[in-house]
């Protein structure tokens, strides 16, 4: 697209989003919700007990059966772009960088540890100096900047992935070490296939947020889902 064509495309998306928002608001005045709710989330959250995402979706669908749900799994960067250009109404993830025009509502923090597998030379070692670990071949994430990588104790990565499943595969290969969410790695830890490396040094917590485009928080479809998710999060 030319620069003018791109501007026209973006303006069309904005107007279509506003039109759908008006239709949803009119339906809400009649006491009903209808339309399409486009949700986005990062991968590997299904095993995270701290995020009652499936429960909130179940409640939402039961209370508002006329709403069509569309759920996408994307990287943090793609989620932010999707919300920014109205392809997504709401998204949940860990966002190390923020984009203008979006509202970020903190939810909780997800624990990550640095892992190696039984096939890795360090697996059987008990006292491993920190410099030895930082010299290992490490898996980075495609959405991590060099500064983000350095914050986790590494100067460079030997492999790059765009999903947690891909990261798990490379760590299980024994050729690399890498960070994984605790809840996601737990089944392999329990089977003895993975172990944590120096948790006091390399563990970190990823802050999760729910994001919407600025000015859209009060749209009925979005606000209703936000309220249901917050209610689930507040349950003991």
Model-derived features with residue positions:
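Short helices/loops that flank or line small-molecule/ion binding pockets
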Residues: 72, 77-87, 164-175
